[in-house]
Amino acid sequence: SQVFLNTNMAAAGGVIAALLTSLFATGKMDVTMAINGAIAGLVAITAGPSAPSGGEAVFIGAAGGVLVYFSILFFDKTLKVDDPVGAISAHGTVGILGVMVVPFTSDASFLWQLYGVLAIGGFTYIASLIVTFIINVIMPIRATDEEQDAGLDSTEVGVSAYPEFSD
């Protein structure tokens, strides 16, 4: 029952923190950031959901909600990474946070948590490179300039998505 409580409390903390962060940063509450805040809260608590109290779970989720907001801006605006739903931030950046906060509420070691983050990150990076290379050999991933100009809807499925806007 503690895991159920903490999971929901962290999601709530993530939503509230992401909404407040977007409000303070832009003057508006961004619904997409709220959704990413909920995901961030869930991701942040997942590494160790049984140990924290309900209040600690809210704080962990809120930390995830704030982090996901700034991480999405960093990847989108600074690095120019095409991540339309903020998945890298919500799952990657906040996932690292979630693993690294476990020692605050349990007897886990920060050093071992860091080793885990590096091992998971290294494995994921190498596995992704291999899979992407294989897929690209079988079927090129990048669309040509001509395909992009024509529109991927027409080149890939033979239908124009918005015929009212075509020439």
Task: Give the location of each predicted region.
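Hydrophobic alpha-helical transmembrane bundles of multi-pass membrane proteins
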Residues: 1-167
